[in-house]
Curated annotation (Swiss-Prot):
KW Magnesium (keyword) present: no
Cited function: This is one of the proteins that bind and probably mediate the attachment of the 5S RNA into the large ribosomal subunit, where it forms part of the central protuberance. In the 70S ribosome it contacts protein S13 of the 30S subunit (bridge B1b), connecting the 2 subunits; this bridge is implicated in subunit movement. Contacts the P site tRNA; the 5S rRNA and some of its associated proteins might help stabilize positioning of ribosome-bound tRNAs.
Residue(s) carrying N6-acetyllysine: 3
Database matches in Pfam families: Ribosomal_L5, Ribosomal_L5_C
Family to which the UniProt record says this protein belongs: Belongs to the universal ribosomal protein uL5 family.
Protein name: Large ribosomal subunit protein uL5
GO (cellular component) term, any one: ribonucleoprotein complex
Entries under InterPro entries matching the protein: Ribosomal_uL5, Ribosomal_uL5_bac-type, Ribosomal_uL5_C, Ribosomal_uL5_dom_sf, Ribosomal_uL5_N
Organism: Shigella flexneri
Any single GO BP term: translation
Gene assigned in the entry: rplE
Length: 179
């Protein structure tokens, strides 16, 4: 079991129960899933780029990515409906906790010119979204084998009812918010 999951059950739940005066342990917000999305717009011209992006995503998520397809026809981007234009992974359970731990402790501190993550990236329902400009912040990616530096979107979905609860949940994990 991931250390962060044990830390959540032992420490974070108690802290949030006293902070928000919850009556039951089930009211305490928890991390439900983490979604990683990598859009590869250049995949229209070269399908190999999508395969390389999927391989990178599989390397640091430790799960096979799902190919995402275009929903609409967009003439100026030369995209037709159904074209594969990206890949995504939804992490839950043990893999989610392992990835979350690696994200906080290893990957985020390796971001170039890192000064903390914005605390304003909540969606109004306690879910947090962030963008990463380079996939090479993850140690599983071999820098010499990278054909192109790509970014990705990371969405942390929680059961929190408000942004305040979501922020308190992530802050309890020592999430590196900007001060």
């Amino acid at each position: 079991m991931a250390k962060l999951h044990d830390y959540y059950k032992d420490e974070v739940v108690k802290k949030l129960m006293t902070e928000f005066n919850y009556n039951s342990v089930m009211q305490v917000p928890r991390v439900e899933k983490i979604t990683l999305n990598m859009g590869v717009g250049e995949a229209i011209a070269d399908k190999k780029l999508l395969d390389n992006a999927a391989a990178d995503l599989a390397a640091f998520s430790r799960q096979k990515p799902l190919s995402t397809k275009a929903r609409k026809f967009v003439a100026c981007f030369k995209i037709r409906q159904g074209y594969p234009i990206g890949c995504k992974v939804t992490l839950r359970g043990e893999r989610m906790w392992e990835f979350f731990e690696r994200l906080i402790t290893i990957a985020v501190p390796r971001i170039r010119d890192f000064r903390g993550l914005s605390a304003k990236s909540f969606d109004g329902r306690g879910n947090y979204s962030m963008g990463v400009r380079e996939q090479i912040i993850f140690p599983e990616i071999d820098y010499d084998k990278v054909d192109r530096v790509r970014g990705l979107d990371i969405t942390i979905t929680t059961t929190a009812k408000s942004d305040e609860e979501g922020r308190a949940l992530l802050a309890a994990f020592d999430f590196p918010f900007r001060k």
